[in-house]
């Protein structure tokens, strides 16, 4: 049986998820809400893999002033790279006392699944940790970031992997933005 085509959420929908997380009332025993919000921002706005986001340490900023905003990241296969994290995201992380390894990927996945249900996001629109990374890649590719640069930002060993993200996003956008 063929799996139906999953569509990436639009930037507007991700802003809606962002607002939902910020504005919803606290539930009892909901200690990880802000941790998950920080993960949401790191995956969506910085393009980190969920494992990279969980282990992100804002104390590992590049020491040189000309590289302010670049943070050392230990990525897939224990490879190290520098990634840019916007000052606004660092401010949010600090305001919520972010520490590496406060949660796990399963809890974050469940958090996003619950947000999708509560926002009544249609089944054909995917909302998962890796989807946020794909949205980051898609947005930057469609806004002119060269593929080799995007490859480095995402930490892909092969540019073909990055090209698959972009190809998939273009196919989805053909469906989303059909000409009249």
Q: Where do the model's predicted regions map?
A:
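Conserved tyrosine-mediated DNA breakage-rejoining catalytic core shared by Y-recombinases
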Residues: 55-91
């Amino acid at each position: 049986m063929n799996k139906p085509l999953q569509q990436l959420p639009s930037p507007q929908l991700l802003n809606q998820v962002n607002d939902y997380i910020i504005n919803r009332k606290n539930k009892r025993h909901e200690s990880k809400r802000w941790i998950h919000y920080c993960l949401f921002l790191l995956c969506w706005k910085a393009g980190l893999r969920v494992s990279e986001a969980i282990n992100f340490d804002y104390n590992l900023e590049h020491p040189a002033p000309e590289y302010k905003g670049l943070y050392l990241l230990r990525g897939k296969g224990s490879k190290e790279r520098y990634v840019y994290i916007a000052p606004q995201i660092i401010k949010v992380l600090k305001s919520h006392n972010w520490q590496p390894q406060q949660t796990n990927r399963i809890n974050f996945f469940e958090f996003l699944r619950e947000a999708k249900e509560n926002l009544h996001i249609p089944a054909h629109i995917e909302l998962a940790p890796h989807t946020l990374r794909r949205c980051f890649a898609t947005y930057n590719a469609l806004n002119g970031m060269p593929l080799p640069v995007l490859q480095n930002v995402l930490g892909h060993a092969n540019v073909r992997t990055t090209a698959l993200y972009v190809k998939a996003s273009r196919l989805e956008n053909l469906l989303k933005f059909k000409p009249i």
